[in-house]
């Protein structure tokens, strides 16, 4: 009960800690990208590009999962988007049920570790709260033992910021993506019936290259702006989240067209619902 009250107070009363401001921004970014069908275009394009390779469709799912994780930071939107799109395609092309579902679940949860992860933001906030409490206790103990009010900084306790957490998780996330791809490729080579190659009836010409670039450039640009600004120290996590939210809104704006305002309402309802649920939990 005491820990719960402490967490509640740190969330709603400790106004000088603004780490959690980034959460609704990244949630907004993720849901807007999901509703604008970016995931569908990425999966279709990657499947056409890597389909002829053994296990190519599974590799495409992992790559798209990594791209969505790096642009959304939330797991639910990624798993739902890829499950609805890629699972029927994988089963229709005679993929193993276990490999298909395992690939989708594993690649969908990459959002837990690949920045900008909501989990890492919450973890950084909790570590900061714990470090503040431990620092206060250590200063009180130092004052009681030595009688001095100023404790040397070398004895103080510091915590990792959300940006530090992102920098620490970026390379392990890429390693995890590489391991997933190697596992699917190895399985497809050893047991071809579990992940057969899928032929592409079209031609790999300039038009196809333009199609691939048009599908990849928007999310890659958003990743570069958001993660690049954080990892290089140009912007804080909150500032990068705001830039990412604006970028996602622009990307969704030119896709949710035809002057049908009703297409926007499911996105806004989902955004407010997930944000409210996240802060309540």
Task: Specify the residue positions occupied by each region the protein language model found.
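Alpha-helical transmembrane segments of multi-pass membrane transport proteins
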Residues: 1-281
């Amino acid at each position: 009960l005491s820990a719960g009250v402490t967490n509640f107070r740190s969330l709603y009363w400790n106004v000088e800690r603004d780490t959690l401001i980034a959460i609704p921004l990244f949630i907004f970014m993720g849901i807007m990208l999901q509703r604008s069908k970016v995931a569908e275009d990425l999966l279709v394009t990657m499947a056409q590009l890597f389909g002829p390779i053994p296990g190519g469709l599974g590799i495409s799912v992992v790559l798209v999962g990594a791209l969505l994780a790096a642009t959304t930071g939330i797991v639910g939107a990624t798993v739902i988007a890829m499950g609805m799109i890629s699972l029927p395609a994988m089963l229709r092309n005679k993929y193993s049920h276990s490999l298909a579902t395992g690939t989708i679940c594993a690649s969908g949860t990459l959002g837990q570790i690949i920045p900008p992860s909501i989990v890492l933001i919450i973890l950084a906030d909790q570590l900061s709260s714990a470090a503040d409490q431990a620092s206060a206790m250590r200063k009180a103990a130092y004052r009681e033992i030595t009688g001095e009010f100023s404790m040397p900084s070398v004895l103080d306790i510091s915590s990792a910021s959300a940006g530090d957490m992102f920098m620490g998780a970026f390379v392990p996330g890429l390693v995890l993506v590489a391991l997933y791809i190697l596992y699917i490729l190895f399985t497809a080579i050893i047991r071809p019936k579990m992940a057969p190659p899928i032929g592409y009836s079209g031609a790999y010409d300039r038009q196809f290259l333009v199609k691939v670039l048009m599908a990849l450039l928007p999310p890659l640009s958003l990743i570069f702006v958001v993660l690049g600004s954080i990892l290089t120290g140009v912007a804080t996590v909150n500032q990068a989240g705001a830039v990412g939210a604006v970028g996602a809104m622009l990307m969704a704006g030119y896709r949710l067209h035809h002057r049908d305002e009703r297409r926007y309402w499911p996105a806004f309802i989902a955004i407010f619902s997930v944000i409210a649920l996240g802060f309540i939990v």
